[in-house]
């Protein structure tokens, strides 16, 4: 107020005589004279304003030199002299206006939920590190970089992304660092023959190629197409098939994805509001000469001087010369423009006189007065502005300035106040609002996934992946749901916001759902579909779907909701682009904007700001307007190549851009502060801000009871409306009908729709059906509410209820082009025409009892209708001679009724009342009718019918579909007049019918006991009114009512996914699917047992042989193991055997018909055997071999007398058959493209049929040969003698494989084995000279030549991930047999218990230890918890204990064999223990350790007396086995690629075999060492003494793991625990010199005693229910300690163990496996036996020491085993200690450095990890390559190449080597080291990158790798 009245004071300005340069000014008495400005301007202010603390002069001269006023005690004295309330000090506001009240303030005590800014402000703690500068000094955003989790990758900028996004081909880091230094990309796998490969590698079905839909997501499936689906009127078709607005043609913008809309353009068609660039592009006219290069060629900025004056800002004045100056300089007496236009009379400048001065009436100024160059200049205080009179001031309305406040603004005189909506809070700047709640997240669709990004951090997370083509999305924050549309799948889906629980919401009736919006208040889902031109609504689960808006919609795109106001907003970029709105019930529709729009894409609502924002991809602009469309303004009009979607949050806009593949942001008011949030995205689509304030709470108008509505409750303004799903009539204001009574039914290729006649809106509704590809024909049956349709893409006939439920395929085989369909509602029959097979067929309405009615003289039959009253059916024929025919519904009385003036007769319809037949002719462009006999023909409609297709009648109307007008029309059925269009703009219209419930009833004899027919009863025009018919391929018997039981003579063939038959009993060829209810994936070979009527087939994908009856029943698998690629199969119906070839295993096998007694017949010198045939009477089998040297061979049916018949001029001999009548062999060769014939000895060879394109299966019956052909996809027939008369039996059969011809009437031959199986106990097999007895694989035949042993005696047992197999060593074939143990996933280790006959195994996928009998039965889990990676397993067959290593937990454990009494034996100083072995007789436990320092250790069976045996020159000690006879250990080293051995003390070490590829496990039997090898995928063996005679036992086996020998010689011997468990209550552990009792780690229900014999033996039902081993007839030696003992490390205390020794695991610690002490109360016999045993052991020990001492004197100094012996030797009572000699580094390739240096261990962990991955995940790596890879950390693999000289010296000093040995070893050492450069192989020089492997990653099978 002071400034207001002070401005009214009078003042006088007295200037000195002279110019302003005198710098002297004088004001009146009542005024203060301000300092003269640099321009000589003088200013006078009222005197009372001097020294008042305000800078009134503007230069502080009125406040200079002032004596500060005295403030009251309650006030604060500012530095500028101003007095303010003391309570305002340090409150965060600048009240002094010089900030002195906020200086030197103590830190404000912020609340607990606040963050203290460095400037003293307090903000919410949630705002700290959220990316917003809330403090104003950015102190709240000075944050430490977030740590990435183990499953994340850190980008170079510090942000975190999902680990699997690293090097995935997509740039996920903002700086692109995730795609740097990546290995070469792996090319996408090729698609199969029935798929199309998109540009970016994705495979889609080939039928989607060039179908007009963007199925790939990048339109690559629609490029280079010869034809496309037509575009709508007003649209231009791009070369790719995309349809765009026709007005965009030649407008300078490339709107087509291939830029074809801008090709061959002469002139651009720019509008009057556009400027045409030199390039032809059209831009806004207002952009002309605006200083921005909008044309991209700068042509819009050229010649601008003649285009008119530039535009000045609103606060500027435009001078005549074009210059812009500030408005305040207007009429100030100064020539600021330069042309004096700012001071001209035209500007109404008041004349200035010398008398005017600020001292007189304040110069006439209302507030401030200044003298500038001798003239008065009025100014105003802050918050005011000068009016046009230049004197008075008026209040500035800051609230009118856009963006001054973020949300709300209240203006007052000279001031204003900002405020925020509920849910927001003012920031410290007092102008901007911040949303309360969590940090905002941008949720966006990226086409193939949906991701989240933090807008201020650019951190990136994946929500959903593996999507097809996600476009639109929205979320429901309260329900934590995300919704999205997929325009490739044409689906709307939803999931939880954590990415779980993905489910379909809307799956039918969608074509291009480009917009999606969630009503979070009323729980509704709205979407737009530019393909159907609709806006629809449904519940959140998709229920009660309703078409809301459909009229005057062209291409609705984006949609946004305002549930609080009950309004929908949407964009439409059709021919008339616009933005519209309506109530959420569809009422009150209105236009928001319809000018200056081209391609309005994204749309969003700022709920707090009450505005809408949208992007226009054509105009390259972001605009905004009020919600009613007013105050429209462009926010951003530059730098927007192709904006797609937009969202808003707080004061920022975020949008996606297709061209830049980025997410961008800018200020929503000004468009400034543009920033790229994310770039290099895959294809950014829709975007939303995920935050609760984007979905503010609102009133639910429908309440808790859905508004009382039965179906939909939709908000309408502030009220609501009850609505019904589309097509359902409304009964009253709240209720809808529950069903439909009548509706128009029509097909549209990809869907089937209905238009309800129960309502007036006539909008069509999609019946929710799945997998509709190309629907053509329709019909219906109102009795069960079924709708039937044919699909010419899937070649099926299906049905469902009219609401889409109960969908079922009723006919799915032997269809090629089912074009017509008719339902006989009287007899419940289904009739159809097939234009591909030229047939008319019939079946029951469920598809059963199908038969062919008419197959002759048909040429592309099309539509069909039936008239059950008269017993006739009618059909149109589209062929060379178009016609309309009729016949009885049983195919009798066939006649042509219309044959002239027809071109393309399409739809048919019968008017049952007037007995008329109607048809539509697309060629004649007419609809006609005639009598049912063809008489009285008349044209009903003969004009304006471009292409009628479907036709139907209802009531007085006729309805038809038209392909060209894309519409459904109707007219009067009698006159053809009163035409109207029901629906238009419907692509791909097909058949049409009216569903109603008034079909006339008809009586028929078929209604009574099926007319007496055994199968089909059909209506007939005959006097009886019906006739009986049989299913396809079956003959009707003479009684005319009964059908024969089945086919007698037929072809049966495999078609990969099914088995089919073609009857040869009838005069036509029709294939019938054998209805086998089993999964088939790749059925190849086939055979038939005519005796039992069963078919046998092999499946090379499922790896099994199965069988079933010919009617599909009694199906079962007979062989399920040991099969790889079974290409050939033959059934010996006489001998009751099945034979097969296996290309994968290169074997020929035989078994009984039930798969039992399986035997390998031929296994040597086979190379891809394929077809096989039998000649039982001759005892021969014949087969083709497809290998490198193709051939035809023969042998006896027992595998004997093998002979090569033909081995020249063969390529790919596929099919094979024997003609017994002519004694000839016939075969088909796909490479030579011939079918050839020879006699049974291979002579007289000649060509029978040539050329044939790609024959596969071949068979023979009577006078004909039949074969399948891959190229023609057909079955062919020819004369077997001449090869002539080749005909097509069946065509259009993709996936054809084997074929057999069967005549069940032919008698079987004589069985050579007779009725008693030839006296054989197992197999009796024919041979040319009779027969032979044989045994199943691996079992020996006894000397009598008839009887087989019950099982093999000695055999190998090995694991191969998903299987356990056996190889008998009793027989010579060495073929593997699967042990049928169920539920195997990833078997690693195994062992066998010969007492119970059980195999024990570990499964690291399930983390269990299990056991089972060898026949696969009695499988049970022994250990089912607490395991991580059990790599080693061993059975103590004497004490009945089980031992295992756990690499994941670094433990060795034991339990009873049933898993009880579990106990950890060793759990320290272990680093990845692997293999384990036990020696019960010695009481020893051995294991390998794969860790940082590899070693092999030994302990007692209780874990005590632990000792390192080998710790030098080891890489990856994998397998371990014991030779109990020679008392030696053998192990394989997968890194050093060798097999070694040593004695039980680790001495006398010897390399047995070098240069093995990658051995994993090994075992020993007799003189052989057997091992498995990962790289060679084989089992091999070598002589254990010499290392020679290396042989491959089994080859080509994936995933080989453990291997053991089962033999009576392996598990022998005993110990004290072998009798009654040693008297122990729980665990009994034998040791080297005694035994101990132990208790489990977790007590059980039985008391545990450490004293043997104290507890009575447990009953057999307890955990000790284990059998004792069968012991030899010798007394066991048992030795017990009489006192409790504690084991410690050698030489006394543990403290004397060095740190280095501890690292090497050389110290036995006192806390390791402290054994329990035996008790005192032992039986006397035990004591006596113990004393005798002590004496015996002492004698043996002494003898052994003497022997070794003498032996060392005579040992050959050159023996290699001494080279690797331990460096020190001690007595048996002492622990061996090995000094830690430094290992040499491979890097500098030095053998030995005297000075030593730090110890170097193997840098092999990374390669080990890779092997670990192979162990758990099923990888099979090329290990030669793996070893060459470099470490990601720069380390090189170091190999222990040379022995250390110190090691030799230590051996010598310890006495283990004499002088000769020492000298010899030193010489060898120097020799080895000098040759290290040549001896070192390249694969020793690298290591692998760290894979980050964890044990938990396990896969169930190799197929998952």
UniProtKB/Swiss-Prot annotation:
Keywords for the protein's UniProt record, in alphabetical order: Calcium, Cell membrane, Developmental protein, Differentiation, Disulfide bond, EGF-like domain, Endocytosis, Glycoprotein, Membrane, Receptor, Repeat, Signal, Transmembrane, Transmembrane helix, Wnt signaling pathway
UniProt keyword annotation of Disulfide bond present: yes
The organism's place on the tree of life at top rank: Eukaryota
PANTHER family xref list: LOW-DENSITY LIPOPROTEIN RECEPTOR-RELATED, LOW-DENSITY LIPOPROTEIN RECEPTOR-RELATED PROTEIN 2-RELATED
Residues in LDL-receptor class A domain copies: 26-67, 70-106, 109-144, 147-183, 190-226, 230-266, 269-305, 311-350
SS bonds (residue pairs): 27-44, 34-57, 51-66, 71-83, 78-96, 90-105, 110-122, 117-135, 129-143, 148-160, 155-173, 167-182, 191-203, 198-216, 210-225, 231-243, 238-256, 250-265, 270-282, 277-295, 289-304, 312-324, 319-337, 331-349, 358-369, 365-378, 380-393, 399-409, 405-418, 420-433, 702-713, 709-722, 724-736
Tissue-specific expression: Expressed in different regions of the brain, mainly in the olfactory bulb, at lower level in the cerebral cortex and hippocampus.
Family: Belongs to the LDLR family.
Listed InterPro entries: 6-blade_b-propeller_TolB-like, cEGF, EGF-like_Ca-bd_dom, EGF-like_dom, EGF_Ca-bd_CS, Growth_fac_rcpt_cys_sf, LDL_receptor-like_sf, LDLR-related
Low complexity: compositionally biased ranges: 1671-1690
Compositionally biased region (Polar residues): 1872-1881
Role this protein plays: Mediates SOST-dependent inhibition of bone formation. Functions as a specific facilitator of SOST-mediated inhibition of Wnt signaling. Plays a key role in the formation and the maintenance of the neuromuscular junction (NMJ), the synapse between motor neuron and skeletal muscle. Directly binds AGRIN and recruits it to the MUSK signaling complex. Mediates the AGRIN-induced phosphorylation of MUSK, the kinase of the complex.
Subcellular location per the Swiss-Prot or TrEMBL entry: Cell membrane
LDL-receptor class B repeats: 480-522, 523-565, 566-609, 610-652, 653-693, 785-827, 828-870, 871-914, 915-956, 957-998, 1093-1135, 1136-1178, 1179-1222, 1223-1263, 1264-1306, 1397-1439, 1440-1482, 1483-1526, 1527-1568, 1569-1610
GO MF term set: apolipoprotein binding; calcium ion binding; coreceptor activity; protein homodimerization activity; receptor tyrosine kinase binding; scaffold protein binding
Residue ranges crossing the lipid bilayer per the database entry: 1724-1746
Secretion signal span: 1-20
Post-translation changes: N-glycosylation is required for cell surface location.
Protein name: Low-density lipoprotein receptor-related protein 4
Subunit structure comment from the entry: Homooligomer. Interacts with MUSK; the heterodimer forms an AGRIN receptor complex that binds AGRIN resulting in activation of MUSK. Interacts (via the extracellular domain) with SOST; the interaction facilitates the inhibition of Wnt signaling. Interacts with MESD; the interaction promotes glycosylation of LRP4 and its cell-surface expression.
Positions in the Extracellular compartment: 21-1723
Annotated region described as Disordered, given as residue ranges: 1659-1696, 1853-1905
Alphabetical GO biological process terms: amyloid-beta clearance by cellular catabolic process; dendrite morphogenesis; dorsal/ventral pattern formation; embryonic digit morphogenesis; embryonic limb morphogenesis; endocytosis; enzyme-linked receptor protein signaling pathway; generation of neurons
Domain EGF-like: 354-394, 395-434, 698-737
């Amino acid at each position: 107020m002071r400034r207001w009245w002070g401005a009214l004071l009078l003042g006088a300005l007295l200037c000195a005589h002279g110019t302003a340069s005198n710098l002297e000014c004088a004001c009146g008495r009542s005024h203060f004279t301000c300092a003269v400005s640099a321009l000589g301007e003088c200013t006078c202010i009222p005197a009372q304003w001097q020294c008042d603390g305000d800078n009134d002069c503007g230069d502080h001269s009125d406040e200079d030199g002032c004596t500060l006023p005295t403030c009251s005690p309650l006030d604060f004295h500012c530095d500028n002299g101003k007095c303010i309330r003391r309570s305002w000090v340090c409150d965060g506001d600048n009240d002094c206006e010089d900030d002195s009240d906020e200086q030197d303030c103590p830190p404000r005590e912020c609340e607990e939920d606040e963050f203290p800014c460095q400037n003293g402000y307090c903000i919410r703690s949630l705002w700290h590190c959220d990316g917003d500068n809330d403090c104003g000094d950015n102190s709240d955003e000075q944050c430490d970089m977030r740590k990435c989790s183990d499953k994340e990758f850190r980008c170079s900028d510090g942000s975190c992304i999902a680990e699997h996004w690293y090097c995935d081909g997509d740039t996920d880091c903002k700086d692109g660092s995730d795609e740097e230094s990546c290995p070469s990309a792996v090319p996408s796998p090729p698609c199969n023959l029935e798929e199309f490969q998109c540009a970016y590698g994705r495979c889609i079905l080939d039928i989607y190629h060039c179908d007009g839909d963007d199925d790939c997501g990048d339109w690559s499936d629609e490029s280079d197409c010869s034809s496309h689906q037509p575009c709508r009127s007003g649209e231009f078709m791009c070369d790719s098939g995309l349809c765009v607005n026709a007005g965009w043609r030649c407008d300078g913008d490339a709107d087509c994805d291939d830029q074809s809309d801008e090709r061959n353009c002469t002139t651009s068609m720019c509008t009057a509001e556009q400027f045409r660039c030199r390039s032809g592009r059209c831009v806004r006219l207002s952009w002309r000469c605006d200083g921005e290069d909008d044309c991209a060629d700068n042509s819009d900025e050229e010649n601008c001087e003649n285009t008119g004056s530039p535009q000045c800002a609103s606060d500027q004045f435009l001078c005549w010369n074009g210059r812009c100056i500030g408005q305040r300089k207007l009429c100030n007496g100064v020539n600021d423009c330069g042309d004096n236009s700012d001071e001209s009379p035209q500007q109404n400048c008041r004349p200035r006189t010398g008398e005017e001065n600020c001292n007189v009436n304040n110069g006439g100024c209302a507030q401030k007065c200044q003298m500038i160059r001798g003239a008065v200049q009025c100014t105003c205080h802050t918050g005011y502005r000068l009016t046009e009179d230049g004197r008075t001031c008026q209040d500035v309305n800051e609230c009118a300035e856009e963006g001054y406040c973020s949300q709300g603004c209240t203006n007052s005189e000279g001031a204003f106040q900002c405020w925020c909506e509920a849910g927001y809070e003012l920031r410290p700047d007092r102008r901007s609002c911040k949303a309360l709640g969590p940090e905002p997240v941008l949720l966006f669709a990226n086409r193939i996934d949906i991701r989240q990004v933090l807008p201020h951090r650019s951190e990136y997370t994946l929500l959903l992946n593996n999507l097809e083509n996600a476009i639109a999305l929205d979320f429901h924050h309260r329900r934590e749901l995300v919704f999205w549309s997929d325009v490739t799948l044409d689906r709307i889906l939803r999931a939880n916001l954590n990415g779980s629980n993905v489910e379909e919401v809307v799956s039918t009736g969608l074509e291009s759902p480009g917009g999606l919006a969630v009503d979070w208040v009323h729980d509704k889902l709205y979407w737009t579909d530019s393909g159907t031109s609709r806006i629809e609504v449904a519940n959140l689960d998709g229920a009660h779907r309703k078409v809301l808006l459909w009229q005057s919609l062209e291409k609705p795109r984006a949609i946004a909701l305002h549930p609080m106001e009950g309004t929908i907003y949407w964009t439409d970029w059709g021919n008339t682009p616009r933005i519209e709105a309506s109530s959420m019930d569809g009422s009150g529709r209105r236009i928001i904007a319809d000018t200056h729009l081209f391609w309005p894409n994204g749309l969003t609502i700022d709920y707090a700001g009450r505005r809408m924002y949208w992007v226009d991809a054509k105009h390259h602009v972001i605009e905004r307007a009020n919600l009613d469309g007013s105050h429209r303004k462009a926010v951003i009009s530059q730098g927007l190549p192709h904006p797609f979607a937009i969202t808003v949050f707080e004061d920022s806009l975020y949008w996606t851009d297709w061209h830049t593949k980025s997410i961008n942001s800018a200020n929503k008011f000004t468009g400034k502060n543009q920033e790229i949030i994310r770039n290099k995205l895959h294809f950014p689509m829709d975007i939303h801000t995920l935050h609760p304030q984007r979905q503010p709470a609102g009133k639910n108008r429908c309440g808790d009871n859905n508004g009382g509505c039965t179906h939909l409750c939709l908000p309408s303004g502030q009220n609501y409306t009850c609505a019904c799903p589309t097509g359902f009539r409304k009964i009253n204001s709240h209720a809808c009908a529950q069903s439909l009574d009548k509706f128009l039914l029509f097909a549209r290729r990809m869907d089937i729709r209905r238009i309800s006649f129960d309502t007036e809106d006539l909008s069509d509704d999609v019946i929710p059906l799945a997998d509709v590809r190309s629907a053509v024909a329709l019909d219906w049956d109102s009795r069960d509410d079924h709708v039937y349709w044919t699909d010419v893409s899937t070649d099926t006939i299906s049905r469902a209820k009219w609401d889409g439920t109960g969908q079922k395929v009723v006919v799915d085989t032997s269809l090629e082009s089912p074009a017509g369909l008719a339902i006989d509602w009287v007899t419940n029959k289904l009739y159809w025409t097939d234009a591909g097979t030229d047939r008319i067929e019939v079946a029951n309405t469920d598809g059963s009892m199908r038969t062919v009615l008419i197959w002759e003289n048909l040429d592309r039959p099309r539509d069909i209708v039936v008239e059950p009253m008269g017993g006739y059916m009618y059909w149109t024929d589209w062929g060379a001679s178009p016609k309309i025919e009729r016949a009885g519904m049983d195919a009798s009385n066939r006649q042509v009724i219309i044959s002239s003036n027809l071109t393309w007769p399409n739809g048919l319809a019968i008017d049952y009342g007037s007995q008329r037949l109607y048809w539509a002719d697309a060629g004649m462009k007419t609809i006609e009718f005639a009598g049912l006999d063809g008489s009285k023909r008349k044209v009903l409609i003969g004009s304006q019918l471009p292409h009628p297709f479907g036709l139907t009648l209802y009531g007085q109307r006729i309805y038809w579909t038209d392909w060209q007008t894309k519409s459904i029309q109707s007219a009067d059925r009698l006159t053809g007049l009163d035409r109207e269009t029901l629906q238009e703009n419907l692509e791909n219209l097909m058949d049409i019918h009216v569903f109603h419930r008034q079909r006339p009833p008809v009586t028929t004899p078929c209604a009574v006991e099926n007319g007496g027919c055994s199968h089909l009863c059909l209506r007939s025009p005959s006097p009886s009114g019906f006739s009986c018919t049989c299913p396809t391929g079956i003959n009707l018997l003479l009684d005319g009512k009964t059908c024969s039981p089945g086919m007698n003579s037929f072809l049966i063939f495999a078609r990969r996914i099914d088995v089919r038959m073609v009857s040869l009993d009838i005069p036509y060829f029709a294939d019938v699917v054998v209805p086998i209810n089993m999964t088939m994936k790749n059925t190849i070979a086939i055979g038939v047992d005519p005796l039992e009527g069963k078919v046998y087939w092999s499946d090379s994908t499922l790896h099994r042989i199965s069988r079933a009856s010919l009617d599909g029943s009694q199906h079962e698998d007979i062989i399920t193991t040991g099969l790889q690629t079974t290409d050939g199969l033959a059934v010996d119906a006489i001998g009751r055997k099945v034979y097969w070839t296996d290309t994968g295993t290169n074997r020929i096998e035989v078994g009984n018909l039930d798969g039992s007694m399986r035997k390998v017949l031929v296994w040597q010198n086979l190379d891809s055997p394929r077809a096989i045939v039998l000649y039982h009477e001759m005892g021969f089998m014949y087969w083709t071999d497809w290998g490198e040297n193709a051939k035809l061979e023969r042998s006896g049916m027992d595998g004997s007398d093998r002979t090569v018949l033909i081995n020249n001029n063969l390529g790919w001999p596929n099919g094979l058959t024997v003609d017994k009548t002519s004694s000839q062999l016939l075969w088909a060769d796909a490479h030579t493209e011939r079918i050839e014939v020879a006699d049974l000895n291979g002579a007289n060879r000649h060509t029978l049929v040539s050329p044939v394109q790609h024959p596969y299966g071949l068979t023979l019956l009577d006078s004909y040969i039949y074969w399948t052909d891959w190229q023609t996809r057909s079955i062919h027939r020819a004369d077997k003698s001449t090869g002539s008369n080749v005909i097509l039996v069946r065509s259009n059969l993709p996936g054809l494989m084997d074929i057999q011809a069967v005549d069940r009437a032919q008698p079987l031959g004589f069985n050579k084995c007779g009725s008693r199986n030839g006296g054989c106990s197992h197999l009796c097999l024919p041979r040319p000279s009779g027969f032979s007895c044989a045994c199943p694989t691996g079992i020996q035949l006894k000397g009598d030549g008839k009887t087989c042993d019950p099982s093999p005696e000695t055999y190998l047992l090995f694991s191969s991930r998903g299987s356990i197999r056996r190889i008998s060593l009793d027989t010579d074939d060495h073929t593997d047999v699967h042990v049928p143990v169920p539920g195997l996933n990833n078997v690693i280790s195994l062992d066998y218990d010969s007492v119970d006959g059980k195999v024990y195994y570990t499964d690291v996928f399930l983390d269990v230890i299990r056991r089972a009998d060898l026949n696969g039965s009695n499988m049970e889990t022994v250990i089912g918890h607490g395991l991580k990676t059990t790599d080693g397993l061993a059975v103590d067959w004497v004490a009945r204990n089980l031992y295992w290593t756990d690499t994941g937990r670094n433990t060795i454990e034991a339990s009873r064999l049933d898993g009880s009494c579990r106990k950890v034996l060793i759990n320290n100083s272990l680093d990845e223990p692997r293999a384990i072995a036990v020696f019960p007789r010695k009481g020893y436990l051995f294991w390998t350790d794969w860790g940082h320092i590899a070693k092999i250790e030994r302990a007692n069976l209780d874990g005590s007396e632990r000792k390192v045996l080998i710790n030098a020159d080891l890489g990856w000690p994998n397998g371990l086995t014991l030779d109990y006879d020679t008392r030696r250990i053998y192990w394989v080293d997968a890194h050093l690629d060798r097999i070694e051995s040593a004695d039980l003390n680790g001495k006398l070490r010897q390399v047995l075999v070098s240069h093995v590829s990658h051995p994993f496990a090994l075992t020993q039997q007799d003189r052989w060492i057997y091992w498995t090898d990962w790289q060679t995928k084989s089992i091999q063996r070598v002589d254990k003494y010499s290392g020679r005679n290396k042989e491959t036992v089994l080859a080509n086996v994936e995933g080989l793991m453990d291997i053991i020998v089962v033999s009576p010689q392996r598990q022998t011997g005993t110990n004290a625990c072998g009798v009654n468990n040693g008297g122990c209550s729980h665990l009994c552990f034998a040791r080297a010199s005694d035994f101990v009792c132990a208790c489990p780690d977790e007590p059980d229900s039985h008391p545990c005693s450490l004293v043997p014999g104290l507890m009575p033996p447990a009953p057999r039902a307890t955990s000790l229910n284990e059998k004792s081993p069968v012991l030899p007839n010798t007394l066991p030696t048992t030795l017990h300690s009489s006192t409790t003992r504690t084991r410690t490390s050698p030489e006394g205390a543990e403290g004397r163990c060095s740190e280095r020794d501890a690292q090497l695991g050389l110290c036995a610690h006192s806390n390791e496996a402290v054994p329990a002490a035996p008790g005192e109360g032992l039986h006397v016999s035990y004591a006596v036996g113990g004393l005798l045993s002590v004496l015996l052991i002492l004698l043996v020990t002494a003898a052994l020491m003497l022997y070794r001492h003498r032996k060392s004197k005579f040992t050959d100094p050159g023996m290699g085993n001494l080279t690797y012996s331990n460096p020190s030797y001690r007595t048996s009572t002492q622990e061996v200690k090995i000094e830690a000699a430094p290992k040499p580094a491979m890097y500098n390739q030095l053998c030995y450095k005297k000075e030593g240096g730090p110890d170097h261990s193997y840098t092999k962990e990374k390669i080990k990890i890779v092997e670990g991955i192979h162990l758990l995940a099923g990888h099979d790596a090329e290990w030669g390559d793996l070893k060459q890879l470099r470490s990601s950390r720069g380390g090189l693999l170091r190999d222990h190449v040379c022995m250390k000289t110190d090691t030799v010296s230590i051996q010598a000093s310890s006495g283990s080597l004499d002088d000769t040995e020492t000298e010899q070893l030193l010489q060898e050492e120097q020799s080895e080291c000098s040759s290290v450069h040549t001896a070192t192989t390249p694969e020793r020089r690298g290591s692998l990158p760290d894979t980050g492997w964890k044990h938990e990653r396990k896969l169930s099978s190799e197929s998952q790798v």
